[in-house]
Amino acid sequence: MLPFGDKTRDMVNAWFSERVHNIPVCKEGIRAHTESCSCSLPQSPHADNTTPGAPARKISASEFDRPLRPIVVKDSEGTVSFLSDSGKKEQMPLTSPRFDSDEGDQCSRLLELVKDISSHLDVTALCHKIFLHIHGLISADRYSLFLVCEDSSKDKFLVSRLFDVAEGSTLEEASNNCIRLEWNKGIVGHVAAFGEPLNIKDAYEDPRFNAEVDQITGYKTQSILCMPIKNHREEVVGVAQAINKKSGNGGTFTEKDEKDFAAYLAFCGIVLHNAQLYETSLLENKRNQVLLDLASLIFEEQQSLEVILKKIAATIISFMQVQKCTIFIVDEDCPDSFSRVFQMEWEEVGKSSEPLTREHDANKINYMYAQYVKNTMEPLNIPDVTKDNRFPWTNENMGHINTHCIRSLLCTPIKNGKKNKVIGVCQLVNKMEEKTGKIKAFNQNDEQFLEAFVIFCGLGIQNTQMYEAVERAMAKQMVTLEVLSYHASAAEEETRELQALAAAVVPSAQTLKITDFSFSDFELSDLETALCTIRMFTDLNLVQNFQMKHEVLCRWILSVKKNYRKNVAYHNWRHAFNTAQCMFAALKAGKIQNKLTDLETLALLIAALSHDLDHRGVNNSYIQRSEHPLAQLYCHSTMEHHHFDQCLMVLNSPGNQILSGLSIEEYKTTLKIIKQAILATDLALYIKRRGEFFELIRKNEFSFEDPLQKELFLAMLMTACDLSAITKPWPIQQRIAELVAAEFFDQGDRERKELNMEPADLMNREKKNKIPSMQVGFIDAICLQLYEALTHVSEDCLPLLDGCRKNRQKWQALADQQEKTLLNGESGQAKRD
């Protein structure tokens, strides 16, 4: 027959294997603490399922597919919080123990106890019941349960969870008395340290016995049966003690008592293990909820560093029960000092408080500790500053320390997001007992919590600093734009000259020939091009319809001209003017104005004149490859977006506001059309959208009444005007082609020199003999079908298509001639060879 203890163990194991799911045990084990516990959560099996550049997935959302409490809840006042009401516990009541001596009844009692263990996680209540069960077997006078704890220095000690449990005693009576025992001192400390049971007949004859407890309680201890409670790794997690055998064997505990005690203590081990796992998970959950609430509180404020520092200090003081919290912000320009210091005391929580500055500093020793932590980048926990001799300034400032009543101190660095730089220091002074207000040392749990909290503090502070930096940058930008707009505006003398000339006489559109699609600007001066532009605005009725002041219009035209770079061969003011002239001709001679609103006409002319503002002589591809700052501003159509921004800058500059006569809605509509029109000059967007337009024309389904189709037409019209040089008479087309080639070759030279890359044939100076064939390819791929579609919409735009076809014939002839010359050259070379 198996011994009672072995039978019990086998029976319990069998019962648990059938009814209880395995509980994963954390790697670092379970340690009971007087205030809280912490434990590393087991790693998810998905942790290694990562992809390059992606964060490691510690856990999958699918693992939470079960009925769980909501993550975000609302309290009674309706405030959103991560903290739930976890105090409500639904548990079955504990059954009362029965004290029968029969072994079969003992097994029944064990099963009854096992059921309680499986459905309850209250360590104190269950262990109290276990002791009452034990009392029925070994009949001792008193029982006590001590749990192993650790302080902030990881020094172990024992604290009573149940003390002096006696027959008839209540749970409240046994759990109210709390006694702390030193490790490896006294009988209990010895058993905890060595993990071996002790059966002592006369306590006062044992040198290990500590009579202080008897002196405190007034109780006389005689015999002691003291046994360790171990977890599954054979680590001592507690000690159970039975005192003074009440009957039989001379008042001493027998070997059978030892076996019975050990058997039932196995249940205590199970209870402690399960309950501590549960308690740890609850504490971890609550701590995470607290951190989430704190993070939410911090990130509510991102605009003012003063406000966020006040929130941080008030939250830490309230939660951690400290007398004073000081937050030091490191000076970026002078890393050895602090730029801002915010200090709050317990009495100031909830009140307005001003940050301390170094000029008003009254406690230099705080700076010394903060400077030390900043330099070492490690936390500092001093239980009693008056007894700490590690730092030379402690003794030098002892009077100062006593004056300000500095005792316990916890100082932690606040690091940036990359954890490689200290951006601040959080310093706590004098932790208080929650009930008495007595000053005590910070423990390991305080260190861990503050370490976690300053991570959120660091993010909050860094984000706020970034916001302040952005605000300063925006302020600087506004000043820069103000200066830029001043210098971007035309000179007053030039404006007055144009205004006077325009007031005297502006030739008619027929005289200036600006309604002709074959128009050439080569014989005009810059001032004459400005006069032509005034005539365009006048003949389109824009000056009259939108109450434009003559002086403002003159200044705006000259300012637009000024903001085109003179060192760019082709994409300069003359190209913008020619684009606007083609737009004017299409609107007037092409009779397209009749199909548009006044706002659309206004927007198209402004867009045509502004569509290449501040062009740098390079295309979008070069901007992207060279990693120009402009490439960081826009994800596509980089230069076109920049042209629109420059257009806005000129339009909003003082003295250039030609749209001031528009209502707010008209102004918004006009800017929207201008933006769409300027972006439409990006050939990449044209190629992307032209298929839809050509299909509408092919099916004869295009209608100006459809807003989307009309918007698409305006985009195509902008491209047609932008490329109109390809439709000019052959002499003009040749000269413009030379300008375009010069600009492209300059970009190719820069690509070869700056980017160390071989340019495309279009940009390659060494391939200039291919210009005719490339022009033919450009006309076929980009231009012909566009002008055919435009002519289908308005037959009066036929000159554009005719000019394009004629120039194609000219370029094809040159290409054929060059190919023939090349073949003849190769043939002659072959004959000579």
From Swiss-Prot:
Binds 1 Zn(2+) ion per subunit. Binds 2 divalent metal cations per subunit: site 1 preferentially binds zinc, while site 2 has a preference for magnesium. Tightly binds zinc. Mg(2+) binds at residue 612. Residues 494-818 form the PDEase domain. Keywords: Allosteric enzyme, cGMP, cGMP-binding, Hydrolase, Magnesium, Metal-binding, Nucleotide-binding, Phosphoprotein, Repeat, Zinc. 3',5'-cyclic GMP binds at residue 775. One of its GO terms (biological process) is positive regulation of vasoconstriction. Its cofactor is Zn(2+); Mg(2+). Its EC number is 3.1.4.35. Phosphorylation is regulated by binding of cGMP to the two allosteric sites. Phosphorylation by PRKG1 leads to its activation. It is an enzyme of class 3 (hydrolase). The active site is at residue 571. Zn(2+) binds at residues 575, 611-612, 722. CDD domains: HDc (cd00077). Residues 82-101 are annotated as: Disordered. SMART domains: GAF (SM00065), HDc (SM00471). InterPro entries: GAF, GAF-like_dom_sf, HD/PDEase_dom, PDEase, PDEase_catalytic_dom, PDEase_catalytic_dom_sf, PDEase_CS. Pathway: Purine metabolism; 3',5'-cyclic GMP degradation; GMP from 3',5'-cyclic GMP: step 1/1. Composed of a C-terminal catalytic domain containing two putative divalent metal sites and an N-terminal regulatory domain which contains two homologous allosteric cGMP-binding regions, A and B. Plays a role in signal transduction by regulating the intracellular concentration of cyclic nucleotides. This phosphodiesterase catalyzes the specific hydrolysis of cGMP to 5'-GMP. Specifically regulates nitric-oxide-generated cGMP. Belongs to the cyclic nucleotide phosphodiesterase family. This is cGMP-specific 3',5'-cyclic phosphodiesterase. It comes from Rattus norvegicus (Rat).
